[in-house]
Amino acid sequence: MKPNMKIFDSMKNLKKMKRISSVLLLLTTAFVLASCVKINDGEVSELSNLKEEIWCGSEGSRIFGQMYLPGNHSGKLPTVILSHSSSLTHAAMAGYADLLALHGYASYCFDFRGGSKESLSEGNVDDMTLFTEIEDLKTVMKTISALDYVDKSRIYLMGSSLGGVVSALVAEEMPASVSGLILFYPAFNISSLVNGFSGFPGMETAFTQSLKDYDIMEHIGNYPGPVLIIQGTKDFIVPPSVAEEASVKYKNAELHLIEGANHGFNKANLGTFGSFVSAEYDDIVMPLVYDWLEK
């Protein structure tokens, strides 16, 4: 019996069509997957941020930091410099920097020299004091303000806890260089906290010694620019009364109390406490920041 050639041809065509369909399916799948892949750091997209490593200062005392930029930016940008809490690093503020960049701000977060054992900046933990951190922030401001894409007339300082204290004190020294202050649970009571632990083993450090006779509240309040203070009502380190007292000292301050929030609005900023304390307040906090910046 002779084979039916039409049947063979039909089968061959069917196989060919299946192969073509398979190739098309693979190409379509690859395209869909590629569109879902996260853009790597350093790539520019209208929907993503550009992250750039920038070092400040001179050899031997260099300060590590990362700049977040809107992916489609052009011209001069308003800029926010973010200072982290005690014993943390730039990583604690990176999420905020990323969000600010999405809203059109150049945002730089950095490691204080000796700020923690995980710090990428040069410097020793044993040498860190409030005043070395003040000098660090001033060094950072000098470097960042000189960048081509930074609008020097719109530089804001944002800090959490000790970083908030440092930002506030730098603004007192350099009011003309600071367009505004954003302070998350600023530890203006840190001197009394340090004095409360005086004499305990391991507490006699350069940092604690430098704060014993230094009342921070006496050194703030003269900065004439706008100040935003955001404070948790359940903060176990900085009571709301501290933020309330500070807000009265400033001539142009806005205070927001976040009900139930502790000393950190997310796990990254709670440090070791983030493992067992619930903290997801960024969705409440950051819209306050955006609105304030746009005023």
Annotate each language-model stretch with its function:
Residues 223, 229-231, 235:
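Short beta-strand/loop motif that positions the catalytic acidic residue
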Residues 39-74:
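N-terminal cap/lid segment of alpha/beta-hydrolase-fold proteins
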Residues 186-219:
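Mobile cap/lid helix-loop segments that gate and shape the active-site cleft of serine hydrolases
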Residues 77, 84-88, 233:
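Active-site glycine-rich loops that stabilize anionic/oxyanionic intermediates
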Residues 86-98, 112, 241:
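The serine-hydrolase catalytic nucleophile loop
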Residues 253-295:
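C-terminal catalytic histidine-bearing segment of alpha/beta-hydrolase fold enzymes
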Residues 99-122:
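Conserved alpha/beta-hydrolase
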Residues 92, 126-148:
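Alpha/beta-hydrolase active-site loop
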